[in-house]
């Protein structure tokens, strides 16, 4: 059951990443059509923009995210117990020892970030250290180091880049349509046939509405899917689903965080603001009860 869940989640992740690229390509094509009647030019701009943005984000994402969440780096002497648990779980996961941070917040939570296993970092709140025993901490840190081992930290960075580029393209197209009236010149309008007008309307709707909406939904689906995978991988590392189950219940019943950055919400083991939508489509995390049910089946 455990390995079947891991394999299924990896397949879902691959499909979601393909969907991201398809959405980006279609949005780029729509942009190229609206601006110059050359869809291929828009596709090149979208892909090149994504690559440039990714290279910028690649430099040092961990430091930026830790700063946004008010996390403070520690050494072994500052908290030997936490340090040794992270060290032990990193050894079991066969990843390099990440940098360790503590967030001064009484609500229990944790997250991992970085660009790859060699440049990773984990952060836990003061609340999680106070409320959880070693078994529960191992479950939580096993989950976070699974994100590192499974390259979820890289996937989340790529997802942020793709959503950012799609949103930028949508905003640029919106301004163009507002100031230029959505057409290239009056002669084009007189000469355009019904099919061309239909294509133009479809391009506008997709670039301005459906593209950004689809990208956001794909990003949320990716985040939820990687949480399931990290849960399963944590059990693979600890051989003890009860530790993570108990930890998730404590986090679910806690107060929202005060120090968390909203743009980083998807990185945490559980939504730090405890706000869940009715449909769950825009949730960054799966429902806690669903996660616990899956863990109980392992």
Curated annotation (Swiss-Prot):
InterPro entries linked: HtpX_protease, Pept_M48_protease_HtpX, Peptidase_M48
A single BP term in Gene Ontology: proteolysis
Cofactor field: Zn(2+)
Bilayer disposition of the protein: Multi-pass membrane protein
Co-factor binding comment: Binds 1 zinc ion per subunit.
Molecular function GO terms recorded: metalloendopeptidase activity; zinc ion binding
Subcellular location as annotated: Cell membrane
Pfam families per UniProt: Peptidase_M48
Top-level taxon in the UniProt lineage: Bacteria
Keywords, in A-Z order: Cell membrane, Hydrolase, Membrane, Metal-binding, Metalloprotease, Protease, Transmembrane, Transmembrane helix, Zinc
Active site: 144
Similarity remark: Belongs to the peptidase M48B family.
NCBIfam families assigned: PRK04897.1 (NF003425)
Protein name (database record): Protease HtpX homolog
Organism of derivation: Lactobacillus helveticus (strain DPC 4571)
Upper taxonomic lineage: Bacteria, Bacillati, Bacillota, Bacilli, Lactobacillales
